[in-house]
């Protein structure tokens, strides 16, 4: 159900391992959640967001991006410090890398390689890329 990328290393977690990681707050900096079951993807997205930015989902520390977006928006969102909190999350829905040029793709991938400890990136897809 989920692929986590931690500083260039990847591991695939099933629901039990993901649930354990969330409970123990051992969440990777970059998380790719995918699946055909919309309910499960949403449930685990909500649990990751609860663990990183809290249940109130303060918009200051939750940055939402969808589809295509200015690459600078992603890099700035990842690099900026959380406000009035210890952590923040960047939620990317329906990322379509084919809509970006080569420089944009390279910038996105480089940004995901070096996510600061106070930031969690969650990439959502209803299908596995």
Regions found by a protein language model. Give the residues of each.
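Non-catalytic interfacial helical region
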Residues: 2-16, 28-31, 38-42, 47-127
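Pre-Walker A adenine-sensing motif
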Residues: 16-22
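Short, flexible turn/loop "capping" segments at secondary-structure junctions
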Residues: 24-26
């Amino acid at each position: 159900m989920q692929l986590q990328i931690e500083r260039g290393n990847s591991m695939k977690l099933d629901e039990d391992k993901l649930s354990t990681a969330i409970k123990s707050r051992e969440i990777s900096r970059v998380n790719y959640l995918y699946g055909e079951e919309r309910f499960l993807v949403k449930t685990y997205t909500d649990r990751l967001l609860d663990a990183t930015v809290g249940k109130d989902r303060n918009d200051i520390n939750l940055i939402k991006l969808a589809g295509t977006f200015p690459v600078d928006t992603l890099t700035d969102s990842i690099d900026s410090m959380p406000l009035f909190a210890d952590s923040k999350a960047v939620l990317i829905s329906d990322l379509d890398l084919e809509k970006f040029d080569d420089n944009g793709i390279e910038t996105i991938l480089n940004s995901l390689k070096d996510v600061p400890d106070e930031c969690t990136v969650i990439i959502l897809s209803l299908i596995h890329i």
